[in-house]
Amino acid sequence: MVDQAVLDKLETGFSKLSSSDSKSLLKKYLSKDVFDQLKTKKTSFDSTLLDCIQSGIENLDSGVGIYAPDAEAYTLFADLFDPIIEDYHGGFKKTDKHPPKDFGDVDSLGNLDPANEFIVSTRVRCGRSLEGYPFNPCLTEAQYKEMEEKVSSTLSGLEGELKGTFYPLTGMSKETQQKLIDDHFLFKEGDRFLQAANACRFWPTGRGIYHNDDKTFLVWCNEEDHLRIISMQMGGDLGQVYRRLVHAVNEIEKRLLFSHNDRLGFLTFCPTNLGTTVRASVHIKLPKLAANRAKLEEIAGKFNLQVRGTRGEHTEAEGGIYDISNKRRLGLTEYQAVKEMHDGIAELIKLEKEL
């Protein structure tokens, strides 16, 4: 049974959301009917509807406004998650199934900007959740420590180009911390959206960063997701970046079991990342197109691309440099997601040259 204090918070939160002019997908799809149907349910990890929606209630300017506290939440609270997923992921219906993992021909993607005129850097990342553990809000301190132990010992077995060092955030020296900040590797305690979702408990316990010696391969442990696996480098050689990521994921997958769902693909804390979990992005200078951000976003939208500021979500473009990535991660294969970004960026560069 969901206890009364939680129910009271839910009722208060629901009326706050209903009377607000929030533009979030949560507000759009959390009808009174759906609310009444879901408010008394809880998963085997004791997660309730409140765990899913509290960030969206606290931050009425959220775009989405919902997180999954554990893998079960996607099924138990499907009446709310499904329409939000369908809306965000371009018509992925509740009868649709995400295709099996397919990285495609890793050698078929090349350098998007051989002359180094436009693209500053290229990055491809994916997220993974470890089977048998809930997501951030439900993790105990002991589980955080156990997961960090598993992840660091797994990563220490990587060889060749992926060989590197794991740095726990707990007890990290000021020097190491500064070095990681200078490299833009260090993640900070979550923003207000993640804070409100209870994704930052026991910080910095269980959190850590691994990177290879070349600083082109990076793993975040227990940031927003259990694992964020990242491949990146300066310039526009998407092919090389993607190849490295695929190699890394395959190596890690031999050693760790990931949380996967037949319908939704790989499971993540935020429903925007479901499926492939792949976000392929460039930091790019398009001075002519970017003179009008609204116009840039409109053109990018035609290619299913998302425009963000230089430092990611909720930031401005510094020095005219934008972060542009694929928007769709669900209902298509990993290769298709990256190819969509590849083709879209190629088009944007072509348009920039024509202006």
From Swiss-Prot:
GO cellular component, one term: extracellular space
InterPro entries xref list: ATP-guanido_PTrfase, ATP-guanido_PTrfase_AS, ATP-guanido_PTrfase_cat, ATP-guanido_PTrfase_N, ATP-guanido_PTrfase_N_sf, Gln_synth/guanido_kin_cat_dom
Keyword Transmembrane helix in record: no
Catalysed transformations (reactions): L-arginine + ATP = N(omega)-phospho-L-arginine + ADP + H(+)
Record-linked Gene3D superfamilies: ATP:guanido phosphotransferase, N-terminal domain, Glutamine synthetase/guanido kinase, catalytic domain
UniProt: ATP binding residues: 121-125, 184, 228, 279-283, 308-313
Tissue expression: Highest level of expression in the compound eye. Relatively abundant in the brain, the thorax and the antennae. Lowest expression in the ovaries.
Domain Phosphagen kinase C-terminal: 118-355
Molecular function terms, GO-annotated: arginine kinase activity; ATP binding; creatine kinase activity
Assigned keywords, A-Z: ATP-binding, Kinase, Nucleotide-binding, Transferase
Pfam families, sorted: ATP-gua_Ptrans, ATP-gua_PtransN
Protein family: Belongs to the ATP:guanido phosphotransferase family.
Function in brief: May play an important role in the energy releasing mechanism in the visual system. By acting as an energy shuttle and/or as an energy reservoir, ARGK can provide both spatial and temporal buffering in delivering energy in sensory cells.
Protein name: Arginine kinase
Gene field: ARGK
